[in-house]
Every structure is written in C-alpha cells, then in structure tokens.
Amino acid sequence: MIVVTGAAGFIGSNLVRGLNRRGIQDIIAVDDLTDGDKFRNLVDCSIADYLDKDEFRERVRGGNLPALRAVLHQGACSDTTERNGRYMLDNNYRVTLELFEYCQAERVPFLYASSAAVYGGSSVYVEDPANEHPLNVYGYSKLLFDQVLRTRMDSLTAQVVGLRYFNVYGPHEQHKGRMASVAFHNMNQFLAEGHVRLFAGWDGYEDGGQSRDFISVEDVVAVNLHFLDNPGQSGVFNCGTGRAQPFNDVAAAVVNTLRAERGEAALPLAELVKKGLLRYIPFPDDLKGRYQSYTQADVGRLRAAGFSAPMRDVQTGVSEYVRYWRALK
C-alpha cells in the first residue's frame, strides 16, 4: 500500500495518476475535502481508500495503519502569503515530522514536498544552508524539516527524500485560486479579456523579465517515481529544470497556443506587446522585498542521483498544458 497525502490536490492527484499508469491502485489517498470541489481531481483515479487528513494523523499517532510500501507526502498549506505562523508550522512542519518518525520506526520510504521558497532572496539555488534565506513563514516551515533531515541523515532506517519544488504548473491546479501557476492565470485572463497582464520591470528586471524555473507537473511526477524506484537514495534535492525563463515566455506560450487554436499565426514577443495582447502593470508595493524575482534550480545533485530524463521547457510544457485544458472545455 502507498500513501499519498494531499492526494486531491495539484501535485498529489498527478502522483496518483502516475502510480495508476504503472498499474498501482493500492493507494490510500489522504486529504482535506473541506473544499469539496477538489474531489474532481480524484474522479479519474483508482485508489484503495480515502482518509481525511485528521483521521490519518490520528492513525499515524496510534500506529494504526496497514503495512506500507511508501509515503508520498504532498499535503501542506502552500499559500505563500499566509501569515499565521502557528497554523503554517503545524501543517507543514509538525505533520511532516510525525510522518517521518512513523516511517522511520516502520522502515517505510518517505518522500516529501519541500520548496524552492527556502532559498528566498538568495541568488544561488544549491542545496546548502548558506543559500537558504526564506522570505516568508511558508518557506521557513519547509526549511525546518529539511534541517531535521540533515541532522538525521547518518541514522536513517529507510529512505527519506525532500524535493524542493520550483514553479510547478499543469493540470488539476484549478482549485488553488490565486496560488495557481502563472500559466493557469495567463490562460484564463486571455480567454476572458483578450490579453495577459504581467508585472512591469522592477529590481533590475525588464517588463515581464522576472524569471523562474518553471517545471511541468509531469516532470515532477517523473522525479518522484525515480526516487520511489531507487530506495537507496536519500537527501534533499532541487526539483526544477535547471533553466530559468521569464514570465514573458510563459505568457507568449499561452497566447500563441490559444491563437493557434483559432488558426492564427504565432507572434514574437515584441509583436504580442505591440498588439496589446501582453500588457504590463506596475509592480505591487506590498510584494517588494518579499518576492523572488529570479529562481533557477541547480540540478547537479538530482542528476547525480541518477535522474537523467530531459525536462520540458516552457514553450513545450505550457503549450501541452493549454491544449489539455482546452480539450476539457
């Protein structure tokens, strides 16, 4: 049996599908369906059981779970603007710690979601404490358990892998609202208003030039499955493409894919701006000093751990995503 927490969420539901594609259906899906619409992310998935996150936590504390092959822990509060530190640390740190202790006691492989938010304003994205300067309590909540893992690496009884997700986009993120990917928001803006809005230049970046390491959720699933297949690998690893691309590239991929749907030719960035299809708005004052203007994963450790598959660039991955979303309409 494999446990997937956050199973009705974005990455979690895609992980369940990835397991299903391998013929694995002995899955315990764990989530909080207070937002009932999230059930839609599990409708086409095959699972053995569903547990509410609170019931699951009690079972972990009581040691009342069946024999497990692995735990893929994706459940967390992912709202980077959440200010309630007590809530954030309980959901993102304390629950992870409890699951870790259970898995170590039972010798069960444990893969968990960390985040590139641990790097904060750093300009170096290598898995090293010298580079970890979170800008918000979300990033700190993720860093805390990474630090625990480092102190326990020499005494592990089973695999533990923390994956620092960079900017993930793809199917089944619609429930995330404002925390959904920029690709999702660009797509909906263009369909509703006929143009896409991006932040104007700030912090030394040109209009729309702020850059992130955007990674398709399909590649995130592939990384998770790689470690599931290689239980001898443990540690904290960046989960990105190793390629920073500007928000302009995401918007252009969205707009040109939707234009192609109408039989219209792709346009270069300058022409998209000239035609008003891409527009720039002032950078918000409340984000200054709290915003990562640039991220690019160093994937050296990931590649050294044996993950050799190529990863999608923005043009490929975002276009796939837009076509997938439009096919549902």
From Swiss-Prot:
Its biological purpose: Catalyzes the interconversion between ADP-D-glycero-beta-D-manno-heptose and ADP-L-glycero-beta-D-manno-heptose via an epimerization at carbon 6 of the heptose.
A GO molecular function held by the record: NADP binding
Positions with a binding annotation for NADP(+): 10-11, 31-32, 38, 53, 74-78, 91, 142, 168, 176
Pathway assignment: Nucleotide-sugar biosynthesis; ADP-L-glycero-beta-D-manno-heptose biosynthesis; ADP-L-glycero-beta-D-manno-heptose from D-glycero-beta-D-manno-heptose 7-phosphate: step 4/4; Bacterial outer membrane biogenesis; LPS core biosynthesis
SUPFAM superfamilies, per the entry: NAD(P)-binding Rossmann-fold domains
Cofactor requirements of the protein: NADP(+)
Domain remark in the UniProt entry: Contains a large N-terminal NADP-binding domain, and a smaller C-terminal substrate-binding domain.
Pfam families: Epimerase (PF01370)
Assembly notes: Homopentamer.
UniProt similarity note: Belongs to the NAD(P)-dependent epimerase/dehydratase family. HldD subfamily.
Protein name per UniProt: ADP-L-glycero-D-manno-heptose-6-epimerase
UniProt keywords, alphabetically: Carbohydrate metabolism, Isomerase, NADP
Top EC category: isomerase
Keyword Isomerase part of the UniProt annotation: yes
Organism: Bordetella parapertussis (strain 12822 / ATCC BAA-587 / NCTC 13253)
Listed NCBIfam families: heptose_epim (TIGR02197)
EC nos: 5.1.3.20
Active site location: Y138 (proton acceptor), K176 (proton acceptor)
GO biological process, alphabetically ordered: ADP-L-glycero-beta-D-manno-heptose biosynthetic process; lipopolysaccharide core region biosynthetic process
List of residues binding substrate: N167, R178, H185, F199, A200, G201, W202, R212, Y291
CC cofactor note: Binds 1 NADP(+) per subunit.
Keyword Isomerase: yes
Source taxon at top rank: Bacteria
